[in-house]
């Protein structure tokens, strides 16, 4: 879950140039090609085809890899500066909005100015018939005297029935968005994302378009028979993909925002998985569960560190499990990352050697086994992952009273918030020393 809103996102499928036409034909046939933006050529020579992210599923990606273009690279990325297509350049939504608002304002005897034009929104999020405007628009005092008719004009220009304007996330601990409803009688909206329905009130809850790559990845995991604990469930961003697509047997969903809990309960019902989920309302640090989880999701940024102790507590004592740890990592050249605090796409991986470290707290020896790391990863991501792994190993020993093995499986990029701030996810395998690694795992020795 996220602490801040973000601008509209253009998601693209990346592949090699020789497969571009096959990909385009398939995406057009499936009505997945984003016709408002141009196909982009990336710095490494790969080609990025803009897609309609809300309709794209992991099944589509698998079909591209296996049937449409066998042997092709098929990954998702976000285009930071997408170029409009020729069709879109006829007249953009922003241009239409500017023309309509200017005409309406001048009809009321108001002189149009460059300052007013600069105060119009340049980005927004569409939620069905509701448009959520960015916080940095309509700030001039003059607009106040033109309400509420102004909002009807704006809504008409954007082709919606309701309008809302966002502000910064409130520092209230529940990640409540500061959103004002400008036009309409309620803020409830619905999204269809990878075959999952999400309903929520935009004035009380948040929805992250930028997390689509991670939601698709979670949906593709094989969790059959597993019990999962989602420590920051929100409206079900990851809880629902784990249940609907990954096949988790049961999910314990923790959330302390009462408005998000209302939405989560509703979303579980409308997606037909309410019988496989228990909601734990309140502070997850006080969670009474223990020795139950095969997998724990810690989807909070900028850091989920406060949830690490309870994540260790809920892991099964006999065989352990996997932690999915979200984190914002600062990547400054020549500087060390600031742990509790890319647009690159994951490509090939290579194994890392086994490393044995001695616990400096006197808890004995902890075995850390290196898994795989993306060749696109920044070194700061890996250093943060190693630091997190060491801390988790120590926590596991403290919580369970015996040493555990920890192993970095992957470090996944989700998105970039700024040139030097990346949202990543660490997949960390945790096993008590008395249990064996899952069959097929090769523990490399130095």
Curated annotation (Swiss-Prot):
Q: List the pathway annotation.
A: tRNA modification; wybutosine-tRNA(Phe) biosynthesis
Residues holding S-adenosyl-L-methionine: 208, 215, 255, 283-284
Alphabetically sorted, this entry's keywords are: S-adenosyl-L-methionine, Transferase, tRNA processing
Q: Which PROSITE patterns match?
A: SAM_MT_TRM5_TYW2 (PS51684)
UniProt EC number: 2.5.1.114
Molecular functions per Gene Ontology: tRNA 4-demethylwyosine alpha-amino-alpha-carboxypropyltransferase activity
As its record notes, the protein acts as a catalyst of:
4-demethylwyosine(37) in tRNA(Phe) + S-adenosyl-L-methionine = 4-demethyl-7-[(3S)-3-amino-3-carboxypropyl]wyosine(37) in tRNA(Phe) + S-methyl-5'-thioadenosine + H(+)
UniProt-listed Pfam families: TRM5-TYW2_MTfase, TYW2_N, TYW2_N_2
List GO BP terms, alphabetically. tRNA modification
At the top level, the lineage of the source is: Eukaryota
The family assignment reads:
Belongs to the class I-like SAM-binding methyltransferase superfamily. TRM5/TYW2 family.
Functionally, this protein is described as follows: S-adenosyl-L-methionine-dependent transferase that acts as a component of the wybutosine biosynthesis pathway. Wybutosine is a hyper modified guanosine with a tricyclic base found at the 3'-position adjacent to the anticodon of eukaryotic phenylalanine tRNA.
What protein name does the entry list? tRNA wybutosine-synthesizing protein 2 homolog
Organism this protein belongs to: Mus musculus (Mouse)
